[in-house]
């Protein structure tokens, strides 16, 4: 066992209202950062940056305005500096996500587009100084798209291999926990090209449901089945048993946010309304929870936690430290490859991310025995092929 992977999504919009920058990441406790999201041009398959100001232009206080040459700034430079300080930290460019996924249908729809996707994504990796690609296609809708996905992964793996030289570039995907979606994937054909799968084991319940429910439970509830429309063990068993995926290639994704249900008596009961949320309706950052007046609850039978306020009658479904403990134990007993979180800006505990301060990331790290039990394989820091002078030179003046 090479050690557990701790995989955190960093979103390029976190630098705005959330005021969360790469410098704020608990870099010591993460083995991988998935930098989200790059987009895909549906006409051509070209992969491109979705917010160049956040990604490569924003000048941080330590950035000079007087550098000569063609230089990179923004989140990409800050991640590059983190990689030099924390050599276990691999940064992957995450392509797609919920909002951009409709572009995959045509963007990966022809052999020409898939070739261009692989070539342009790989060029971004070598230009930006990243360690690989994470593809978040939510979700292939039929067998033709599933076949296109396999071919897309093959082409990406070949392009990364051709470009990596002495480095080791990684290729990962984010995959669904719902049977309607995972049953369409050609897992046995995908696995040879992939370093690991990030299982999106959250969003099981939300505003689209008629009843309040658990959004990230491990097991189904036998006593209150409407409270668990989905469950994680069923998905994990499918990937391993039906799909033939090695257990250590499955990374269990967990939410660092809660989904709210208003005017309800609790899990499995009707509700009306979802409330304001922190940044979007009905969704609260974990660090804003529990809400004032609410008490945290745990159901060990289903591996789920939530908060409830009897006076406001609001339920929020989210992972507490106690639920994170149960999931860390499950990851270890099922011999999974590690943990993934969506997304890093919402955790408690700041940069140190300690379990004692409520950090979900820190809880997992502590539960598996500390950073020495994490994946220590080194990142790449040499990019002679980058178009950016300061990155190519290793950010000498920083």
From Swiss-Prot:
Recorded GO CC terms: extracellular region
Enzyme class: hydrolase
Domain GH18: 4-363
Enzyme Commission code(s) on record: 3.2.1.14
Reaction equation(s) it catalyzes: Random endo-hydrolysis of N-acetyl-beta-D-glucosaminide (1->4)-beta-linkages in chitin and chitodextrins
Record: residues binding chitin: 69-70, 96-99, 139, 200-203, 342
The keyword Secreted belongs to this UniProt entry's keyword annotation: yes
Disruption phenotype: Impairs autolysis.
A GO molecular function held by the record: chitin binding
Family membership: Belongs to the glycosyl hydrolase 18 family. Chitinase class V subfamily.
Name assigned to this protein: Endochitinase B
Species of the source: Emericella nidulans (strain FGSC A4 / ATCC 38163 / CBS 112.46 / NRRL 194 / M139) (Aspergillus nidulans)
């Amino acid at each position: 066992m090479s050690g557990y992977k701790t995989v955190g999504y960093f979103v390029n919009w976190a630098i705005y209202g959330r005021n969360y920058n790469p410098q704020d990441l608990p870099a010591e406790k993460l083995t991988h950062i998935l930098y989200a999201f790059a987009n895909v041009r549906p006409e051509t398959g070209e992969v491109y940056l979705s917010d160049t100001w956040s990604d490569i232009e924003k000048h941080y206080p330590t950035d000079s305005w007087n550098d000569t040459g063609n230089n990179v700034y923004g989140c990409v430079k800050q991640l590059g500096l983190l990689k030099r300080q924390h050599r276990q930290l691999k940064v992957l460019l995450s392509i797609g996500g919920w909002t951009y996924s409709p572009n995959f249908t045509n963007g990966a729809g022809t052999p020409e587009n898939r070739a261009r996707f692989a070539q342009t994504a790989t060029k971004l990796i070598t230009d930006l100084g990243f360690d690989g690609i994470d593809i978040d296609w939510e979700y292939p809708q039929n067998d033709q798209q599933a076949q296109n996905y396999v071919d897309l992964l093959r082409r990406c793996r070949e392009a990364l291999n051709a470009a990596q030289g002495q480095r080791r570039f990684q290729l990962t995907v984010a995959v669904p926990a719902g049977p309607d979606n995972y049953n369409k994937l050609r897992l046995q054909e995908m696995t040879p090209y992939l370093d690991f799968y990030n299982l999106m084991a959250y969003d099981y319940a939300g505003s689209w449901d008629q009843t309040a429910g658990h959004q990230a439970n491990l097991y189904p509830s036998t006593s209150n089945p409407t409270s668990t429309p989905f469950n994680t063990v069923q998905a994990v068993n499918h990937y391993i048993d039906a799909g033939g995926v090695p257990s250590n290639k499955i990374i269990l994704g967990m939410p660092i946010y809660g989904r709210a249900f208003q005017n309800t008596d609790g899990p499995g009961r009707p509700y009306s309304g979802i409330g304001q949320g922190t940044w979007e309706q009905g969704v609260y950052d974990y660090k804003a929870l529990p809400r004032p007046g609410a008490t945290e609850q745990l159901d060990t039978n289903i591996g789920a936690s939530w908060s409830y306020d009897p006076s406001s009658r609001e339920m929020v479904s989210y992972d507490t430290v106690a639920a994170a403990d149960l999931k860390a134990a499950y990851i270890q007993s099922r011999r999974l490859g590690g943990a993934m979180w969506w997304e890093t800006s919402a955790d408690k505990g700041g940069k140190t991310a300690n379990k004692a301060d409520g950090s979900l990331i820190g809880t997992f790290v502590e539960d598996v025995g500390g950073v020495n039990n994490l994946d220590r394989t080194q990142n790449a820091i040499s990019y002679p092929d980058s178009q950016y002078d300061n990155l190519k030179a290793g950010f000498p003046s920083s």
